[in-house]
Curated annotation (Swiss-Prot):
This is 3-phosphoshikimate 1-carboxyvinyltransferase. The lineage of its organism: Archaea, Thermoproteota, Thermoprotei, Thermoproteales, Thermoproteaceae. HAMAP family: EPSP_synth. It is found in: Cytoplasm. Pathway: Metabolic intermediate biosynthesis; chorismate biosynthesis. The active site is at residue 297. InterPro entries: Enolpyruvate_Tfrase_dom (IPR001986), Enolpyruvate_Tfrase_sf (IPR036968), EPSP_synthase (IPR006264), RNA3'P_cycl/enolpyr_Trfase_a/b (IPR013792). Belongs to the EPSP synthase family. Signal peptide: none annotated. Phosphoenolpyruvate binds at residues 20, 88, 116, 159, 328, 369, 395. CDD domains: EPSP_synthase (cd01556). It comes from Caldivirga maquilingensis (strain ATCC 700844 / DSM 13496 / JCM 10307 / IC-167). The keyword Ion transport does not apply. The gene is aroA. Catalyzes the transfer of the enolpyruvyl moiety of phosphoenolpyruvate (PEP) to the 5-hydroxyl of shikimate-3-phosphate (S3P) to produce enolpyruvyl shikimate-3-phosphate and inorganic phosphate. GO terms for molecular function: 3-phosphoshikimate 1-carboxyvinyltransferase activity.
Amino acid sequence: MIVRINKSVAFGSVKAPRSKSWAIRLILLSAISDEETTICSIPDSDDTEAALRMIEVLGSKVIRQGNCIRVIPNLRQCGGYVNVGGSGTVMRLGVALASSCRNPVIIDGDETLKRRPIRELLESLRSLGVNVNGDSLPVAINGPVKGNYVEIRGDLTSQYISGLIMLGLVSGITIRVIGDLVSRQYVDLTRRIIEESGCSVGVSNDVITVNECIPRISLSNVPGDYALSGFYTALALATGGLVTVTGLPKPLGYGDDSLVNIFSNAGARSVFSNGDWSVEGGGELRGIVVDLKDSPDLAPVVASIAPFASGETVITGVRHLAFKESNRLETISDSLRAFGVNVNHGDDSLRISGSITHGALIKCPNDHRIAMMSGVVAAGSNGESIIHNAECVNKSNRLFWRDLVKLGVKLTIN
């Protein structure tokens, strides 16, 4: 798919994309329950479909009913082959849960996923007595778990820890996190969803303790996603418009919903009220310094408004962007440079100078957030921009390009 975008002014409102982070965790937890689970407002995304394929291999029956799914679990029937596409979350959480199976589970993925970190998680499972064949995808997992103590690095991806926490519900586990924990908000999210299902997760400094517990999820609606919604509201700042995203939970001031305050700190009018987040452009944006160690998915959103701000925007705490769908330290930099933006990156930071941007040719590196970032910058830039491989947004939000048209962006799809 090729998308062509010309300079626009974005006005209007759109519904918030549903959170795939929430959805994937709810779906996977439903597979280790002992009762039927109904989950509604499931996001239409490649990663969500990967999670559903994963739980079918874990023995669950999935029944689709409109925008809801019913999951009938049967962990005793787990086993088989599954391809999880490009979903790092499903890969890592799924590998951990597959360790509870007494039949082999073979997990595979696309070429982008085969380059992403997993070896440390596999080593931790081996230390728990799990039979693991392979050090990268495809990998064969054959449980059960025989130990209950594991140490694992926290500085590569928080998904290692989230996966082991979920496994702990089946077998009991004590996890010692070695080094800094990145993307902490996602471990907090895993813990929150588990506790809402009636189980508990103990945390004391760098040690996490999970006792065996059967999660029971009542009818659950997947909430809106701030990191994905941020690309819509960023359009208002890039184009001098006014955009409202509806259907979002009340911001808590940390994690992905900190975008509401980040935009305000940059000089924008950014207001949340009764589930709606409104952002108005047209005023003077200023460069800011922001640490995104706990919220790495916000980096492409902040980067999308940085060219339209005066001065320099500095994004820190982003070392682990190198291990995303693409090396985002490089792909954010390369994409912005194509628009004429002055960008420098180190091992743990991005420095972006406000610039007069022009149209660009972007060959998206199969990374949904890079495509979305490029779409925002293109809408605020002089001349025509062309984005190749634009269908990569389907990983998290199939409606992205349609929604941009709804907001008034001059966009054609070929």
